[in-house]
């Protein structure tokens, strides 16, 4: 990864800054040798969404071939099923995904660690919290760093990648040391 600054559109917009910092963290972690990113969380989210949309598409298609009075039951069942799928999707995002931005497996010789990285910026706050958690053969560890976004972004609204990389590496090294 190049150490060029990444431009942020509006440094006062919390969600934009969080997304930009998350992308930088993902790029840094993807560049680590021996890491394989896992897309299981996103794949399950897509599957739940696809099932909900499939119910909607079936309802539209069925209504096209069997106009409304005959299709009333199918439309009702498909509509309720769609909203149930969207409720499941929302619960999945709240309780399973949480704020996870990156999942990966690190293979180190014969051992492997499963990593989950998450981030958070509270509304109307300038504190960016980066959390990491790993699991390996019954052992686990977790840690986090909380700093002002001003530590990573200059006055022009550019993310200073080397500073973010240093924080990510420090958090990673701290967790690896605590494991041993």
UniProtKB/Swiss-Prot annotation:
Quaternary structure annotation from Swiss-Prot or TrEMBL: Component of the signal peptidase complex (SPC) composed of a catalytic subunit sec-11 and three accessory subunits spcs-1, spcs-2 and spcs-3. The complex induces a local thinning of the ER membrane which is used to measure the length of the signal peptide (SP) h-region of protein substrates. This ensures the selectivity of the complex towards h-regions shorter than 18-20 amino acids.
State the protein's name.
Answer: Signal peptidase complex subunit 2
Tell me what organism the protein belongs to.
Caenorhabditis elegans
Q: Which InterPro entries match?
A: Spc2/SPCS2
- Has the keyword Transmembrane been applied to this entry? yes
Q: Does the keyword Cell inner membrane apply?
A: no
Record-level GO cellular component terms: sarcoplasmic reticulum; signal peptidase complex
Instruction: Describe the task this protein carries out.
Output: Component of the signal peptidase complex (SPC) which catalyzes the cleavage of N-terminal signal sequences from nascent proteins as they are translocated into the lumen of the endoplasmic reticulum. Enhances the enzymatic activity of SPC and facilitates the interactions between different components of the translocation site.
Q: Which family does it belong to?
A: Belongs to the SPCS2 family.
- Which regions face the Cytoplasmic side of the membrane? 1-45, 94-180
Which ranges sit in the Lumenal compartment? 67-72
